[in-house]
Design a protein with these regions (language model features):
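Gram-negative bacterial Sec-dependent N-terminal signal peptides
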Residues: 1-25
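N-terminal low-complexity, acidic/Ser/Thr/Gly/Pro-rich segments
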Residues: 25-26, 33-761
Length: 761
């Protein structure tokens, strides 16, 4: 025993002596120079990483077994042209200085990952080992993430790590990535995905909001920049070195891993944002709360209603997220040399075109009825509301709608109770809820742009614009595994869904500024008063409710969406006029006239309304989304988005057919007249709609126009070679509020074709 100890000591001494060349004496002066200013740097390299399971365990409902959502059989490999996956982390604590000159004592953290490809063979929703009767673990599909540019994150603080009163700087660079969701050897892919963000702001922990990252603090706001990113794929020779994609780029493609992906749609955003905020916590108590907005005699009434059914999981925990930001436009005091916010929307792939939207503004042009008051300088904005993510197990859930939708549906209560489960029993599902999403932005300028695969499209910025603001959107979405049968009769795996969505048509904030859900086109030509005239036309103040459940399947060359049940109800105003706060234009032939402001609450009035439209469609349907072809030399004539769909109305019983108060599926055009004391509403109606309709179409984004070709089939099955059902409806008038039947109509077959081309000036 003693000999062994002596031998070990001898061995230690020999090893120490052998390595003594690496050691040197340090005096006090040298020690005083060691400040740790270089921090800690960690570099890790791997040729491959395998992970069997990566699971998120949701506590679900109190007293019940948890549900897991995870990525299984993960494989991370190097990207083509790289030997290893290189991960580097630099961490330093001490004196810091941000790019804007702010100094302090905090941390600097820099992390990067070289290009890689990560694949998860299964996205699993698991109840095991405690599955209830009839429940099984569910495979929801596959996931893949790959990059061709390094993924980089940089964070610098000026006072510790979390401090609501001291600035931080964040760079987040996920550039030229590819993110795919797969089913049946087909992938829905975000190609050239960018989330390229640079921001100054504040990072802190709040007792209510949780972890908060915001650009706005007690001493003012800062800029968040979505910087454009160099396009490294499919760039035209004339644009090499200058081709860029938006800082937030969502480019949807579809196809198998071994084929050229086809083209769906592209959405992008770039430029400077303000009042940006991200908050993350586990508080789920708000998931059962619905804010609804009712309109009574032109007055707005906002109410909070707590749903009673299906939200027992709110006391157990989950993920709660809030994201919001304001858009900037020319003249914003924080912009400096920065670029205002722009949106891009259009087709994608070789030879494609899109529309760039700019001058993002609120609905109201002014905030005062004084004709000499300044133009509204408030920002347009997006607030994604309160987002809740959970794994749930239920077969009953409540969803609250406003008074307008309750009337259209003929519902007894504001809370609509439904079963989101694919069976009659409670099932485990992945669940996402949104409460109070607002997108209040009008794009008053627009121009056509070209894809980087072709030469630059040098069209001038037009005087037209588009507004698709959304007010108080609430949504429930549940997802689960579900089988379906394709057109060839083959049973395939699909993603089951159950979705409920609602919007409110009109509301006002605490200062009386209007909010709306609308789809309007803007004419921003100059008026006789020397400012934009702001004519608009379209559907405004849209109250809507959409409820569907079914399955999403990935077929070869097409995306298949089946709705086993589909209910869509809405009420809107068909209107033409000028935006609130604009100056009324002078009459034709008159060059000068007195300045008068369009009322700020103009959207709450009926002055611009041509008619109101309301409808309810209740039945089932199918939608086939067919992506555009991707090929060298592609053009809008070969690369376009098309679709085929059909909808079958629910059959009414003989009792309901003979009951005039039962409208079934209907469309109504109405007009309201008022003499100041009494109001009368008359309407023209198509009630009790039945049959099987088909709708096919294609959308072509051209160099300077949008062209839509459509075909409506009045007896879908008959035209498809089967035994069909004629389209039938009841024509009725309601001149005094009482429904009066005029006639029955039936269309036994045939198709109606139309082509709509929109060429802005």
């Amino acid at each position: 025993m003693h000999k062994i100890i002596k031998l070990n000591l001898l061995t230690l001494c020999i090893c120490a002596a052998n390595q003594s060349y690496a050691l040197q004496a340090l005096n006090d002066q040298i020690l005083s120079d060691v400040t740790g200013q270089d921090g800690i740097s960690i570099t890790h390299e791997a040729s491959k990483v395998d992970i069997k399971q990566l699971n998120w365990v949701d506590p679900a409902e109190v007293g019940k077994t948890p549900i897991k959502l995870g990525l299984h059989n993960i494989e991370v490999k190097t990207a083509t042209g790289y030997n290893n996956i290189k991960t580097k982390l630099d961490f330093d604590v001490g004196t810091t200085q941000l790019a804007n000159g702010t100094q302090g004592v905090g941390i600097q953290l820099s992390a990067s990952v070289s290009p890689f490809t990560a694949t998860a063979a299964q996205i699993m929703l698991m109840c095991s080992p405690n599955c209830a009767t009839g429940e099984t673990d569910q495979n929801l599909g596959s996931f893949k993430l790959s990059t061709i540019s390094p993924f980089e994150v940089y964070l610098a603080t000026t006072n510790g790590l979390f401090n609501r009163d001291s600035k931080v700087h964040l760079d987040f660079k996920l550039q030229n990535a590819s993110i795919s969701y797969g089913q049946n050897n087909q992938d829905l892919t975000l190609k050239d995905f960018n989330f390229n963000l640079s921001a100054d702001g504040y990072l802190y922990i709040d007792e209510t909001e949780g972890v908060v990252l915001t650009s706005k603090g007690s001493v003012g706001d800062n800029i968040v920049v979505l910087g454009r990113v160099e396009d490294k794929t499919d760039v035209h020779d004339s644009r090499v070195g200058n081709a860029t994609n938006p800082g937030l780029n969502v480019d949807l493609r579809y196809g198998s891993a071994n084929s050229t992906h086809r083209n769906l749609i592209r959405i992008g955003a770039s430029g400077a944002l303000t009042n940006g905020k991200i908050a993350l916590n586990a508080d789920q108590t708000g998931v059962a709360k619905f804010n609804t907005v009712n309109r009574v005699n032109g007055n707005v009434q906002e109410n909070e209603v707590v749903a009673s059914a299906g939200y027992g999981f709110k006391n157990a925990g989950g993920l709660h997220l809030n994201v919001s930001a304001d858009f900037t436009r020319a003249g914003n005091s924080l912009l400096g040399a920065g670029t205002p916010t722009t949106f891009e929307l259009g087709h994608t792939g070789t030879g494609s075109y899109a529309i760039e939207f700019s001058n993002l503004s609120p609905l109201n042009v002014r905030t005062s009825t004084d004709p000499n008051s300044a133009i509204n300088s408030q920002n347009a904005y997006i607030d994604f509301g309160q987002i809740y993510i959970n794994n749930i197990r239920t077969n009953s859930m409540g969803f609250v709608v406003n008074d307008q939708i309750k009337t259209i549906l003929g519902a007894q209560n504001y809370e609509l109770i439904y079963n989101p489960s694919p069976t009659g029993n409670a099932s485990n599902m992945a669940f996402i809820a949104v409460r109070g999403l607002d997108f209040q932005a009008i794009a008053r300028k627009a121009r056509f742009i070209s894809d980087n695969s072709i030469a630059v499209n040098n069209t001038n910025e037009g005087t037209w614009g588009l507004g698709i603001p959304i007010y108080n959107l609430n949504a429930n979405a549940a997802f689960f595994a579900k089988k379906y049968t394709n057109t060839a009769g083959t049973v395939k795996d699909g993603l089951g869904y159950d979705i409920a969505v609602s919007t409110d048509g009109y509301g006002e904030d605490s200062q009386g500024n209007p909010k709306t859900t609308s789809i309007i086109v803007i004419d921003g030509a100059m008026s006789k008063h020397g400012e934009e005239v702001n004519y608009y036309t379209g559907l405004r103040n849209i109250d809507s409710y959409f409820k569907a459940n079914g399955v999403i399947g990935f077929n070869e060359n097409e995306i298949y969406i089946k709705a086993d049940s589909l209910l869509f109800a809405a009420n809107a105003e068909i209107a033409i006029g000028q935006l609130p706060g604009s100056l009324y234009n002078c009459p034709a032939g008159v060059n000068t006239c007195a300045k008068e402001v369009v009322p700020i609450n103009n959207f709450a009035k009926k002055d611009d309304v041509l008619a109101s439209i309301a409808f309810m469609l209740d039945g089932k349907g199918e939608l086939f989304i067919i992506p555009g072809l991707e090929a060298a030399g592609g053009t809008p004539q070969s690369n376009y988005l098309s679709f085929k769909s059909n909808f079958e109305f629910n059959t009414l019983s003989s009792t309901d057919l003979s009951n005039e108060s039962k409208k079934g599926s209907f469309i109504s055009l109405s007009n309201t007249d008022s003499n100041g004391t009494t109001t009368k509403t008359s309407s023209f109606n198509l009630n009790k709609m039945q049959g099987h309709l088909g709708l096919n179409g294609k959308i072509q984004m051209q160099k300077d126009a949008v062209v839509m070709d459509n075909q409506v089939q009045f007896n879908h099955k008959a035209l498809a070679g089967g035994q069909g059902t004629a389209f039938r409806a009841e024509v009725a008038l309601s001149p005094t509020g009482t429904m009066q039947k005029v006639a029955d109509i039936a269309i036994t077959g045939g198709a109606m074709r139309s082509t709509l081309g929109i060429t802005p000036r």
